């Protein structure tokens, strides 16, 4: 601690004087920073007046400090007595130091002017406070409010950013989480409804009312033949719609069951139609083959008849040949007899 200057003979008086001088030096430095330096006072060194008072004028700044400390006291606290000289400075400052822990709000109109001419305060003295008081209440001024507003703006700007980690309050997080859950439930319900509607539409489209003219077998044989396919399709349908049943939509369970039965019946009817079409094709093929067989048999019969006709002709020709041979023999005999 830079004490510099006049020291009293007693240790307590010296410490209080050093404290006052240091406090006044700090105050003057703060004023010099805030206000431009004015013209130097006549008849004295400006550096000594700014840093510490002269030894002869010790009583006057001490009295001014005591008055200023009395003005800083709250309304119910007793004021420090006036200080006539250096001897009384210790008592006044000691009582002021005891009551300085809880200073009240300082008003500009209650502050008296300074007593000494060498340490005359600038015109903005009523707007300033001692060094110890603003350190405690630093966050209650306009600059603090401005800083708080900037911090709030910065927080709002961080909320608007798309990247980075932003500290969101817990209440907002819970509300957003509940909103997300409600939205997901609504989306699940809508998806289930749309899926059921599409399945019903597909089942209606698959049902062909004009397929009744096809050859139909009795229901017992159909059920017995396609029992395995019905069980497999029912298992597929139950596994497909088990999620819908487990998801907690009892309103749509009936629709899901109806759609499942429609899907199973549609698949069965489609398989039956395919099989009936195959049977019709096979029967048509059989008819074609039978017709071919009949045609071939007819051709074979015709050929047999022709063969019989040819055999008869051959017999007739052989008979004629025998007759011609006999006639030739007779002619040869006649010619031989004539030539003799």
Swiss-Prot record:
GO terms for biological process: actin filament bundle assembly; apoptotic process; apoptotic signaling pathway; negative regulation of B cell proliferation; negative regulation of fibroblast proliferation; negative regulation of gene expression; negative regulation of T cell proliferation; negative regulation of T cell receptor signaling pathway. Changing residue 71 to A: Loss of interaction with SPSB1, SPSB2 and SPSB4. A motif (B30.2/SPRY domain-binding motif) lies at residues 68-72. Residues 1-18, 193-203 have a biased composition (Polar residues). Widely expressed. Expression is elevated in various neurodegenerative diseases such as amyotrophic lateral sclerosis, Alzheimer, Parkinson and Huntington diseases and stroke. Down-regulated in several cancers. Residues 300-340 are annotated as: Leucine-zipper. A motif (Nuclear localization signal) lies at residues 145-161. Keywords: Apoptosis, Coiled coil, Cytoplasm, Nucleus, Phosphoprotein, Transcription, Transcription regulation. Residues 145-203 are annotated as: Selective for apoptosis induction in cancer cells (SAC). GO terms for molecular function: actin binding; enzyme binding; leucine zipper domain binding; transcription corepressor activity. Residues 47-82 have a biased composition (Low complexity). Residues 182-192, 242-253 have a biased composition (Basic and acidic residues). The modification Phosphoserine is found at residues 108, 231. The keyword Repeat does not apply. It is found in: Cytoplasm; Nucleus. The modification Phosphothreonine is found at residue 163. GO terms for cellular component: actin cytoskeleton; actin filament; chromatin; cytoplasm; cytosol; intracellular membrane-bounded organelle; nucleus; plasma membrane. Residues 186-206 form a coiled coil. Induction: By apoptosis. Changing residue 68 to D: Increased interaction with SPSB2. Only slightly increased interaction with SPSB4. Increased interaction with SPSB1, SPSB2 and SPSB4. Residues 1-253 are annotated as: Disordered. Transmembrane segments: none annotated. Preferentially phosphorylated at the Thr-163 by PKC in cancer cells. Homooligomer. Interacts (via the C-terminal region) with WT1. Interacts with THAP1. Interacts with AATF. Interacts with BACE1. Interacts with SPSB1 (via B30.2/SPRY domain); this interaction is direct and occurs in association with the Elongin BC complex. Interacts with SPSB2 (via B30.2/SPRY domain); this interaction occurs in association with the Elongin BC complex. Interacts with SPSB4 (via B30.2/SPRY domain); this interaction occurs in association with the Elongin BC complex. Component of a ternary complex composed of SQSTM1 and PRKCZ. Interacts with actin. Pro-apoptotic protein capable of selectively inducing apoptosis in cancer cells, sensitizing the cells to diverse apoptotic stimuli and causing regression of tumors in animal models. Induces apoptosis in certain cancer cells by activation of the Fas prodeath pathway and coparallel inhibition of NF-kappa-B transcriptional activity. Inhibits the transcriptional activation and augments the transcriptional repression mediated by WT1. Down-regulates the anti-apoptotic protein BCL2 via its interaction with WT1. Also seems to be a transcriptional repressor by itself. This is PRKC apoptosis WT1 regulator protein. It comes from Homo sapiens. The gene is PAWR.
């Amino acid at each position: 601690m830079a004490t510099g200057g006049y020291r009293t003979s007693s240790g307590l008086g010296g410490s209080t004087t050093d404290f006052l001088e240091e406090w006044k030096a700090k105050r003057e430095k703060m004023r010099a920073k805030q206000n431009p330096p004015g013209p130097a006072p006549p008849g004295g060194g400006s550096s000594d007046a700014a840093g510490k008072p002269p030894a002869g004028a010790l009583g006057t700044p001490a009295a001014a400090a005591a008055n200023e400390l009395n003005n800083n006291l709250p309304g119910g606290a007793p004021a420090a007595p006036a200080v006539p000289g250096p001897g009384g400075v210790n008592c006044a400052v000691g009582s002021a130091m005891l009551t300085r822990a809880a200073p009240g709000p300082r008003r500009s109109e209650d502050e008296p002017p300074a007593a000494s001419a060498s340490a005359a305060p600038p015109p903005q003295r009523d707007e300033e406070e001692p060094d110890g008081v603003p350190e405690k209440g630093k966050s209650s001024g306009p600059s603090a409010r401005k800083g708080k507003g900037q911090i709030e703006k910065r927080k709002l700007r961080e909320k608007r950013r798309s990247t980075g980690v932003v500290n969101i309050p817990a209440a907002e997080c819970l509300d957003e989480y509940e909103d997300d859950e409600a939205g997901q439930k609504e989306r699940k319900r809508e998806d289930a409804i749309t899926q059921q509607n599409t399945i019903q539409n597909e089942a209606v489209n698959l049902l062909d009312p004009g397929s009744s003219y096809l050859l139909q077998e009795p229901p017992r044989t159909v059920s017995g033949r396609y029992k395995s396919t019905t069980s497999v399709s029912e298992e597929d349908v139950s596994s497909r719609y088990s999620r819908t049943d487990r998801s907690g939509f009892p309103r749509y369970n009936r629709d899901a069951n109806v759609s499942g039965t429609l899907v199973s019946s549609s698949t069965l009817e489609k398989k039956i139609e395919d099989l009936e079409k195959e049977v019709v094709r096979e029967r048509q093929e059989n008819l074609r083959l039978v017709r071919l067989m009949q045609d071939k048999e007819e051709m074979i019969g015709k050929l047999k008849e022709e063969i019989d006709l040819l055999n008869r002709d051959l017999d007739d020709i052989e008979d004629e040949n025998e007759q011609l041979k006999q006639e030739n023999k007779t002619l040869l005999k006649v010619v031989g007899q004539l030539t003799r």
